[in-house]
Regions:
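Active-site beta-strand/loop signature of hydrolases that rely on acidic residues for catalysis
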Residues: 97-98, 228
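Acidic-and-aromatic substrate-binding clefts and catalytic sites of carbohydrate-active enzymes
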Residues: 166, 230-238
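Short, Lys/Arg-enriched N-terminal segments with co-localized hydrophobic residues
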Residues: 1-10
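Short catalytic-loop micro-motif centered on adjacent basic/acidic residues
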Residues: 155, 224-230
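Sec-dependent signal peptide recognition
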Residues: 12-18
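Substrate-binding/active-site clefts of carbohydrate-active enzymes
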Residues: 34-47, 52-92, 98-220, 241
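Boundary at the C-terminal end of the N-terminal hydrophobic targeting segment
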Residues: 29-31
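Bacterial N-terminal signal peptides
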Residues: 18-26
């Protein structure tokens, strides 16, 4: 089911692997057997806070609003330091902006947009504490586990488009014009439009890339996924996922 101007909510029961399409504001959600995220939405009891991990607990020591050399950007591990603060505010759902790698070619600004996904199957190295012995997956899992200890559910954002970098390495994922050039959606010059296909014929390559993202989120133990601008993809795409 597509949510007008927003997205879709998909609940995935890990035991049966059955897909249930359900309405919810702004996203697509995967829930395990003990996950109550769907009921929170349906009962209007979800107190949601959106965070960009890259800046959420960044250490801007000199206060110039730039993470200079020697200053730590926000990451999975230092974000844990602020979870008690989030809990004390009565927040029970964290909407985490995209954690996928950020494209650098044609990037907007110096850091690039987190919605310009360089791929859909790995974790943004900017969000990883280089001083930790834990892997990127382990660090992400630790953050989510610490959220769960505080009764905070975690929704991870799924970008709607791919970065220009991804177009260069995987052109089969994208729509092309008559000159075989990529298509820029609206004025988002750092991303290119994915070729998801139609309700009658989906693009299996794009579908497989998104399924890899779903598998990553399930591996991390997150409670849900918000699908950004979900209505630009055919409804059959979300049903298939």
């Amino acid at each position: 089911m597509c949510i007008p101007n927003q997205g879709v909510m998909i609940m995935l029961k890990k035991i049966s692997c059955a897909l249930i399409i359900a309405a919810a504001a702004g996203g697509m959600v995967f829930a395990g057997e003990n996950n109550d995220l769907r009921s929170l939405f349906l009962k209007n009891k979800a107190n949601i806070c959106g965070i960009n991990l890259r800046t959420f607990n960044a250490k801007d020591i000199n206060g110039n609003e730039i993470i200079d050399e020697g200053e730590a950007g926000g990451n999975f591990l230092n974000a844990i330091e602020r979870l008690d603060e989030i809990q004390n505010l009565g927040i029970n759902v964290l909407h985490v902006l995209p954690i996928t790698p950020v494209g650098r070619l044609k990037a907007l600004g110096t850091a690039g947009s987190v919605y310009a996904a360089e791929d859909f199957w790995s974790i943004n190295p900017q969000l990883v504490d280089k001083n930790s012995n834990l892997s990127d997956i382990e660090q992400a899992k630790k953050f989510i586990n610490e959220c769960h200890k505080r009764n905070i559910r975690v929704i991870i954002d799924l970008p709607s488009c791919g970065a220009y970098d991804l177009f260069l390495t995987h052109p089969e994922l994208f729509i092309k014009d008559s000159r075989q050039c990529s298509i820029v959606p609206t004025d988002w010059t750092d991303v290119r439009l994915l070729n998801t296909g139609t309700n009658k014929r989906l693009n299996q390559d794009v579908l497989d890339a998104h399924k890899r993202f779903v598998n990553l989120v399930l591996e991390l133990g997150a409670d849900g996924i918000r699908a950004d601008v979900a209505t630009i993809k055919p409804s059959a795409f979300w049903v298939e996922i």
